[in-house]
Amino acid sequence: MEPSIYSFSLYTALPLMLFFGFYFLFAKTPEKKIFKNYLRSRQIMGIAMLLLSANYSVHFFFGIRFKNADSSILMNMSTYFLCYSLFSSALIMLLDRFYITKRRVWTHIILWIIFSTLSGVVVFLVPSGIIQKISLFALAVWLVVFGVVLARRVIVAYRRAIRIFNETQADDIGAYIEWLSIFTYWALIFGVGCGLLTFLPDEYVFIWILSSIPFYSYLFYSYQNYLLFYEQVENAFEQDIQSEEELLTNSETEHDIVSEKEVLSPIQNL
């Protein structure tokens, strides 16, 4: 691969990545409490975009892929693993404000540390040869499986959201957020594929980099549009939560009444 083509692809993608990342991180939202969760989701997505931008920057300014291929593989795999967690968390938060917990955050951090450490051991300590190739393949499989599991969580969350909107007769909103499902399947194909694309022959790497431009552009466009309907979406979720709480309360009340009748019945017979 000619460095000029590779550099041009990075030169094209990097400014957009930086713009999207900083915009997601610092752009304002309507000053309403209901938008707090949307803002957190967008900021997490912004952090993920800036991490990817940092990855692209190292490739662009230092040409690490040409100087040390092993370090390039390690950096890419470690970055993608962390970004998978950030992407999935940001998207699910749009439809489940309770998704992020301390336990889940620490679990993802620990998994990332373990994955990055093992990747470093395989790349730098395991001798080149069949054992190293098998180990790298195993790590790539782990990365892909991790991405698929997270993508499945996103899809399940969105299907639940569509069900809620269908039950509340909010078809217009339900149809509108179907972009989330579309984006999720796109992310599954493109994002999870990064685990395999890390091992692409050099002459095809620029195609992978350029293909990221429409992917992240669609993400930016979708977040901007989703902001228009976010308040209605949150209100629909609030109604669903209240309905579930009412059903739970009614169920507990009926259970208590039945229990009282069972207790009083023998006494009345006396």
Model feature map: region roles:
Residues 2-13, 119-156, 197-207:
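Extracellular-loop-to-transmembrane junctions of the mid-late helices
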Residues 10, 14-17, 42-52, 109-112, ...:
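Residues within membrane-spanning alpha-helices of integral membrane proteins
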Residues 182-238:
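Interfacial "cap-and-anchor" motif at the non-cytosolic start of specific transmembrane alpha-helices
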Residues 223-270:
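Membrane-proximal linker segments that couple transmembrane helices to downstream signaling/catalytic modules
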Residues 17-26, 83, 146-162:
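Membrane-water interface of transmembrane alpha-helices
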Residues 94-121, 136-143, 168-187:
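The cytoplasmic-loop to transmembrane-helix boundary for the fourth helix
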Residues 1-117:
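N-terminal low-complexity or simple alpha-helical regulatory segments
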Residues 27-30, 57-68, 119-131, 191-201:
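Juxtamembrane "helix-exit" motif on the non-cytosolic side of transmembrane helices
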